[in-house]
Amino acid sequence: GVLYVEPDEETLAQMKEKQAQQEEQKRLLELLKGRENKTLDGKTIQLYANIGNSKDLAAVLQNDAGGIGLFRSEFIYLEREDFPTEEEQFQIYKTVVQTMAGKRVIIRTLDIGADKQCEYFHMDKEDNPAMGCRAIRICLTRPEIFKTQLRALFRASAFGKLAIMYPMIT
């Protein structure tokens, strides 16, 4: 965001107008909760949420999402100082799947690298990290980390509709 220190009257008026527009949009979206999602041509669609951790679940449920289209599992790794255990990951995934109560949950496997660095991974600096060793490439070069995550995901899948997304595969 942008911080305005001692904004002038014109800037203050613009920000108040923007705030009013956002509140109106929020109010209109509230009216759509609980209704079927349809395109203009009448086709029913599902709207899924994208989340980074289980703390986002309340907002997902509050906003009536049809499921989770992307759970960014890398934040489990980024929010700590050492590799998460299988049990720690399992408990997180299980909580997400159970909370969604039968709705589809798509969890992306570890997508570390490029803009998401994790100190304890001890990754080499790269000229172009976006195209370098990241995501599935890291998982395949560090199978012990990948297998731990996959075991946790497979265990959690017994508690709901869990699907797995593999990043950076074309």
List each model region and its residues.
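Long, charged amphipathic helices and adjacent flexible linkers at domain junctions
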Residues: 4-42
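Conserved alpha/beta-domain cores
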Residues: 27-170
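Conformationally flexible catalytic loops at phosphate/diphosphate-handling active centers
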Residues: 1
